[in-house]
Amino acid sequence: MGGQIVIEQLEFRGRCGVTPEERARTQPLAVDLELSFQLEDAGQSDDLLHTIDYAKVAQRVVELGVGHDSRLLESMAERFLSALFDEFPVDRIKLWLRKLHPPISQVTRSVGITVERSRLAQQLLRTDPPPARFLIQQLHRLPKGKVLDVAAGNGRHALFLASLGYQVDTVDRDEDAIAQLSSSARARNLTGVTTRALDLEQPPPYKPNLGHETYDAILVFFYLNRPLFPHLIEALKPGGMLFYETFTIDNHLQYRHPRRQEFCLNHGELLDLTASLRVLHYDEGLHEGHHGSESVHTAQLVGLKPFLARSSP
């Protein structure tokens, strides 16, 4: 029988805060954990060896919480997730980490974050290359439903999102990459991934068939095809979101990458190309490299397709 081991209100004192002043002293923190695990053997044997020792889980979490300073609750939560997946045979973890007495006068209770992740999703985060940091940072905005991954390559984003329960359609001109992506999805039993080899850069009057109001979200990472933007926006459902990141001209000027200047966005150009969307997030500047290496100059955008206003009768 599948089930969960639940640990509520595990409290400890740790150093977590954006400012050095907040980190200078410990503060009360708490975490709730839900650990998914197959409980059949333990139920039949009544033997601790066949289950997860929640006392050891609690001890490990407290050790990590007390022994490491963190600027953000998010980084502390990642430390917990990494250790628990590495050291205990859990299938999925859901946690709620919070400051019990945050230094915000208007907050009378707690402030915190929740994270839910499967073992497969954790493994995919460690692939090379891993999912883009920008996608991970904006994951809380990603609406549930159907996603289109444009220029998907070997599927670092598609496989990750499918492991979280998303239905992901992928397109890429590289037939070998698409074949590898399809094979990787089958090997991981990810039935929510579909693949299509498609050249999006054919000359006019070619119009790519990406659908009409089909997707809840569209991802484009490190691929720039300016004539494609109207088709991307058309393919979004009203209320759907575009997640976009690629190089700016500063990266070409500083690093000569990409080699061709036309493959880079000019300053503010991404906002012009997505003017019909409502901007939920935009940042242009130096960001961590998409392979986790040295920083690169990119523009990052999350844009929402508005619902059409109803006309008055």
What are these regions (language model features)?
Residues 285-313:
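Core SAM-dependent methyltransferase catalytic element
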Residues 167-172:
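Conserved SAM-binding motif I beta-strand of class I
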Residues 144-153:
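Conserved class I S-adenosyl-L-methionine
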Residues 240-251:
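Conserved beta-strand signature within the Rossmann-like core of class I S-adenosyl-L-methionine
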Residues 189-202:
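Conserved SAM-binding strand-loop segment of SAM-dependent methyltransferases
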Residues 174-176:
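Conserved SAM/SAH-binding beta-strand->alpha-helix loop
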Residues 1-127, 137, 150:
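N-terminal, polar/charged subdomain of small-to-medium soluble alpha/beta proteins
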Residues 206-217:
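A short acidic, Gly/Pro-enriched loop at the edge of an enzyme's catalytic core
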